[in-house]
């Protein structure tokens, strides 16, 4: 039996690299209707005809997951997490079954598998489970029978044998975990955008597509608002050296590679992109220690991002979706706390910042000139993140993108 462990990302080898195994993930817009599902089926059959052993991870059709969540809350104001997982996991299964039918009509063999049937084992946290093990025996058997394997993304089975879901973007994580377990050196992520851009093109029409970014940069981008990839999927890819190729579903464009930083990437432009999010809440807490606070938040599976401590006050941010869990923890600790939902976060990200001291000064000067005063600032070797009023987020993204010349071809921009 092939088994590959993932949590907490131990230093171990996955299966031997297999150039013949291709893992492809298709998002909800790629399988939004029967016509698109048939198009995906054709692409999978073509990939197999090219000599590949094909595994495809599919998301739910269009807005199916949102519709199912809405249905749950129409029945119950606070549905039990276990039952919610049982409900919303069906969307991906529908996509896989339909795709398998389409493949059969094209003259190829296919089998659809749920996350549990595919061997995706998770912890016991419903709604945001983490993959702890991949038991790929059934996938290997199907591939050996020349079948295209369709795996329902976003889901698995817990160590307690309950159906679990992996949280938003969880199909990315499913695909990368399978790529690592199957020894596939590349995982192709098909989406409704042409790759990773220097900013959200909806805010900055002149934003450019990046040919390649490092795992480190992509992790920061994903954690700071870029919705192209889920953070966890990039962590697994980096840990198991799986290259990611983000590609458009309905275009021949080359997309963006996410891979280990190499000498060519070290010569790249100073800044790779400007990201933003309005989906975080900023908390200020007094009356506890950092160790006690963050241990309690971790126990509740709250994903903490920004952390700043000044004297007795601890400031941190967490996803808006984690608001109930976070406030339950804070109330349980008996601390004094306040929360702000009227802030957004804008981040400037680039590997070239490691050896360039002037980025922060330039970013703050640009924001000041636009009349924007950051509420909280945090940094890493390749990121500067500013929490600012939500109403100023769009302006901040535009002026920072322009100031760092991100609308110019990479060869013409400032380099490290």
What kind of region is each of these model predictions?
Residues 1-234, 387-392, 404, 408, ...:
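Nucleotide/pyrophosphate-binding catalytic subdomain
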Residues 52, 108, 242, 302, ...:
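Short phosphate-binding/catalytic loops that engage adenosine nucleotides
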Residues 237:
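Acidic-aromatic/histidine active-site loop/patch
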Residues 186-190, 244-246, 305-306, 376:
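Short hydrophobic alpha-helical runs that function as membrane-insertion/retention elements
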Residues 100, 240-241, 245-246:
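Structured, non-catalytic alpha/beta "coupling" segments that mediate domain-domain communication
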Residues 255-416:
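A conserved regulatory-domain signal marking ACT and ACT-like small-molecule sensing domains
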Residues 58-66, 246-265, 311:
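Terminal amphipathic helices with adjacent charged low-complexity linkers/tails
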